[in-house]
Amino acid sequence: MSTPTPDNSPDLLRELIAFESVTLTPNIELIDRVRALLAQAGIPSTLVADPQDARRSNLFASVGPLDVPGIVLSGHTDVVPVTGQPWTSPPFEATERDGRIYGRGSADMKGFVACAVMAMIRAARQPLARPLHLALSFDEEIGCVGVRHLLRALEPMQPAPLLCVVGEPTLMKIGTGNKGKAAYRALCCGQAGHSGLAPHYVNAIHTASDLISALRDVQHDLAEHGPREPGYEVPYTTVHAGTIKGGTALNIVPAECEVNFEIRNVAQDDPNQILARVLDLTRTKMRAAGALPDAEPPRVTTVNSYPGLATPEDSAGVALSLIHI
């Protein structure tokens, strides 16, 4: 049984807000609703689900000729949690005040999703010279998790799109760049022993402190001498240690210490090269501090990463966008 198609984007936004598609929870009801609306307009769509949970899914759809490069409208369907926040209206009910619609995700970014879906439906009635594509993803808020599956599925797509418009909230300004990010977990290993004999054992926290010191030194060098992109509030690559956990008791030399850190890089910087610098400097600091011969450097694993974006401001895509803002 079909349900009526909304008359406009605000009406669809009200529907979308009602789906509690919080990150890491199922979004399939929202996706099914969008898919049904597209089908009613004669637009086929494809789902690319999370391999571990089919209730979380991406959606991809196209209208127009597929033998020429087109434009992608891309948005995520997940929203951040509302727990513990002082909402004055139900977060998953659209509330209109003073010409604005309030609700979780109204700006980030179900408002754009609603506009994109309605644009697809209207485009299906037009003789398009280029295709219009719709890409909806899940779990963007925790590191663009869902779209990775979608991108792999779209790799064979030919011809590649001419332009992708990602409708994140920008106060209607055109954003041409975004820093890349790489998050890491470092396990620093030592040897447990009584603190009265501490010099005989490798102290994992000491290794972690050498790592953190190296992070600070590399950060200082990047701030002073690294490439700069003036469009950002912090115009250079940053490194940051966010959490540290280690040790079991004051009188026991710690056998393990875990440090979680990240690199947020401008497009000109390679996070792999920065990580290599950090680890080389960590080893240098360990030797300088007189680390025992069997002390090993931190074991680093990548938790999450995504590349940065640097679109030339004189590109055809930016020029096209400026015409329609």
Where are these regions (language model features)?
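Acidic/His- and Gly-rich active-site-bordering loop/insert found
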Residues: S2-R104, R125-L128
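Metal-dependent amide/peptide-bond hydrolase catalytic core
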Residues: P4, R185-H324
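Predominant activation on well-ordered alpha-helical scaffold segments within soluble catalytic domains
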Residues: R14, A114-V117, I121, R148-L151, ...
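Short helix-capping segments at alpha-helix termini
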Residues: A39-A41, R125-L128, P156-P159, K285-P293
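A short, glycine/Asx- and small/polar-enriched loop/turn
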Residues: A54-S57, P65-V68, K179-K181, E233-T237, ...
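Acidic-glycine-rich active-site phosphate/pyrophosphate-binding loop
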Residues: V82-E96, P161, T176-L187
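Acidic/histidine-rich catalytic neighborhood of metal-dependent amide-processing enzymes
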Residues: M109-A183
